[in-house]
Amino acid sequence: MSLANISFCELKRKEVINLRDGARLGAVCDMEIDRCTGTVCSIVVPGPPKLWGLLKSDEELVIPFCKISNIGDDVILVDLVL
């Protein structure tokens, strides 16, 4: 599945997994788009929760589009060195 034929609503339902260590990074919460070209620059996932998971993190993990390896039916695979 390519990003050319996927809606943001579908993208938000997918879990992001890092290929390097198998870590679950969370679900897509936002994306950044280049205003001039209209292309997707990056996807954004929320950072790790605070206070035993009770509070949302102030940090976000911005994943450049070039780091996306594959977009499957249920997950997005990324290749990140964290």
Residue ranges and their predicted role:
Residues 1-82:
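Peripheral interaction segments used for macromolecular assembly
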